[in-house]
Regions:
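C-terminal cap/substrate-recognition subdomain and adjoining C-terminal extension
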Residues: 2-3, 124-134, 142-243
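Alpha-helical substrate-recognition element adjacent to the catalytic core
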Residues: 2-10, 14-17, 21-31, 37-156, ...
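The start of beta-strands in P-loop NTPase/AAA+ ATPase cores
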Residues: 30-32, 194-195
């Protein structure tokens, strides 16, 4: 998001190289942590599909043309409706019903298959595996989304669970994302040495920086849930993985 553009250094890619250097030095005992949504996956195609289907149900032709570029933020559904041509007041009138429609679909195995890769992510993930360090995906997605998530990892040619990576998911959808990720910190410490952690959510990447003080905490300046959280000074922001 543009609010973090000022944090992205001209030589931001050096942080990614530094992670690989640490991974090569650590080998199999080293862990590199990645969130999924808006970190290695772009979920805007999923968001756009949901708006199109809502438009079909409501017979709103303008919404049936929704594409990822209609979103300025993946979480701003009302803004997408306005971008599609609905007057602001009419868009606001759909807010609650659309949110319910969205909630019944977004966090499902079927819909998450529509995600695509953040640019450069597949190549970078495979570069991490080449170092012999291990990847752990730590996501706020719940176990009911595992099948679709693994299918999407395969579609995007990313490192799969059991092939150099491990996938940690919330046991239940209702569990709070923040609490789950903090609980995962203990498991990560038991699995190995956390060398770096990548996450798009300021709250979550801050938690990694505070919990694993010797690790590189890397913020993906892509999209986030919109909570007004200031990034820790130790956190480095990058735009994507392509360099």
């Amino acid at each position: 998001m543009t609010e973090f553009a000022h944090r992205i250094a001209v030589d931001w890619h050096r942080t990614l190289d530094q992670v690989l250097e640490r991974a090569r030095a650590a080998g199999p005992k080293g862990l590199v942590i990645f969130d999924l949504d808006s970190t290695v996956f772009d979920n805007l195609p999923r968001q756009a599909r949901i708006v199109r289907e809502y438009g079909q149900q409501k017979h709103l032709k303008a919404l049936e043309t929704c594409q990822p570029f209609h979103f300025t933020s993946g979480w701003d559904l009302t803004g997408a409706l306005v971008a599609l041509g609905l007057p602001p007041e009419e868009a606001k009138g759909h807010q609650q019903e659309l949110k319910r429609f969205w909630g019944a679909r977004f966090f499902t195995s079927d819909y998450c298959r529509d995600d695509i890769e953040i640019v450069g992510a597949p190549r970078y993930l495979h570069e991490v595996v080449k170092t012999k360090a291990r990847i752990v995906y730590v996501t706020g997605r719940h176990e009911g989304m595992r099948e679709g998530t693994v299918a999407c990892l395969a579609k995007c040619r990313m490192v799969l669970p059991g092939e150099g990576a491990q996938l940690l998911m919330k046991p239940k959808e209702v569990q709070d994302d923040d609490a789950f990720k903090r609980t995962a910190h203990t498991l990560l410490a038991d699995l190995g040495t956390v060398l770096a952690a990548f996450d798009n959510e300021p709250m979550h990447v801050n938690d990694y920086a505070l919990r694993f003080t010797d690790a590189l905490a890397v913020h993906l300046a892509t999209d986030h849930s919109g909570r007004p959280v200031k990034l820790q000074d130790a956190v480095v922001s990058v735009p994507h993985f392509a360099y």
